[in-house]
Amino acid sequence: MKPTVISAEALFEAHRTALRWEWLAGHAHPERRFDEVAVRDAQSAADLVGYLNYIHPYRVQIVGRREVRYLVDVPPEDQERRISRIVTLEPPVVIVADQQTPPDRLVAMCERADIPLFVTEESAGHVIDVLRAHLSQHFADRTTRHGVFMDILGLGVLLTGESGLGKSELGLELISRGHGLVADDAVDLYRVSQTALEGRCPDLLLNLLEVRGIGLLDIKAIFGETAVRRKMRLKLIVHLVRKETMERDFERLPYEPLYEDVLDVPVLKAVIAVDAGRNLAVLVEAAVRNTILKLRGIDTYQEFIARHRIAMEGDEPI
């Protein structure tokens, strides 16, 4: 599920410093919110913020240099009609950017209709970029998964598996080998675009790793700043299973890459059997390196199949 509301006041306060804007009109209803249907139907944040557009009234309307010219460089009756049309459509927020002075009629009508009007000297394009990034994160589909989320060789890797298989101990071993911790036990995952998932740690568990027999470890305090990460894009799920489960439910050499859907985004998956004497940290690193090759278009298994086919056809000696 994803949130479907955000108030004008929350949007203003979130970027008061970055965009250096002023709330000029429409103070009476600071809790004014986006249309919930528009938020649910939005395919991306681009549907929620953009330049002045009468066809998409339910998004934040950005008024830049050209839009101000469109509104004011006309006879008074046309100016009244064009500005009235903006206000009648009841957008959640109107923002005047590009160092432009908002027309007096726009200020008056927004004040009368209780539509928040923000003014900033920042460029309209920059305002759109900042707000789209913010709304993309705020309205993202989200879920919480159990596991250990790590940065391994620059790749976001989620370690999952049954309780008691040593996920946290494996995470600690990987941290000692120079990799970074994002989250332990509970991992918040957000779909920040149609094909990308971002994982973060809940504030309550930030920098903490729980190991049986030892308790809670503050990874940042023990290993330093470079041992923790604020967030990572999820690229690989490493699923730990018992040996008997591996033999019963999984192929030794799967012909096709394994994937797991998370928030309707397919994520590459590697399955590793936990057994006495196996160096899981080395195996996870190997799985990550192999995934990096796959993401670059190099599939070792398919190359082996191609070699085998050539050998079977007699083009090369076996």
From Swiss-Prot:
- Where do the catalytic residues lie? 146, 167, 185, 252
Q: Which cofactor does it need?
A: Mg(2+)
State the source organism's domain of life: Bacteria
Molecular function per GO: ATP binding; magnesium ion binding; phosphorelay sensor kinase activity; protein serine/threonine kinase activity; protein serine/threonine/tyrosine kinase activity
Broadest EC class assigned to this enzyme: transferase
Q: Which residue stretches belong to region Important for the catalytic mechanism of both phosphorylation and dephosphorylation?
A: 209-218
Query: Which reaction equation describes what this protein catalyses?
Result: [HPr protein]-L-serine + ATP = [HPr protein]-O-phospho-L-serine + ADP + H(+); [HPr protein]-O-phospho-L-serine + phosphate + H(+) = [HPr protein]-L-serine + diphosphate
Identify the keywords attached in UniProt to this record, alphabetized. ATP-binding, Kinase, Magnesium, Metal-binding, Multifunctional enzyme, Nucleotide-binding, Serine/threonine-protein kinase, Transferase
EC number(s): the record gives 2.7.11.-, 2.7.4.-
Name the positions where Mg(2+) binds: 168, 210
Does the UniProt entry include the keyword Hydrolase? no
- Return the InterPro entries for the record: HPr(Ser)_kin/Pase (IPR003755), Hpr_kin/Pase_C (IPR011104), Hpr_kin/Pase_Hpr_N (IPR011126), P-loop_NTPase (IPR027417), Ser_kin/Pase_Hpr-like_N_sf (IPR028979)
Q: Does the keyword GTP-binding apply?
A: no
Query: Record-annotated residues binding ATP?
Result: 161-168
A Pfam family of the record is Hpr_kinase_C
What HAMAP family is this protein classified in?
HPr_kinase
Q: What is known of its domains?
A: The Walker A ATP-binding motif also binds Pi and PPi.
Function, in words: Catalyzes the ATP- as well as the pyrophosphate-dependent phosphorylation of a specific serine residue in HPr, a phosphocarrier protein of the phosphoenolpyruvate-dependent sugar phosphotransferase system (PTS). HprK/P also catalyzes the pyrophosphate-producing, inorganic phosphate-dependent dephosphorylation (phosphorolysis) of seryl-phosphorylated HPr (P-Ser-HPr).
Remarks, miscellaneous: Both phosphorylation and phosphorolysis are carried out by the same active site and suggest a common mechanism for both reactions.
Q: Which family does it belong to?
A: Belongs to the HPrK/P family.
What PANTHER family does UniProt report for this protein, alphabetically? HPR KINASE_PHOSPHORYLASE, PROTEIN YJDM-RELATED
Q: Tell me, how does this one assemble?
A: Homohexamer.
This chain's protein is named: HPr kinase/phosphorylase
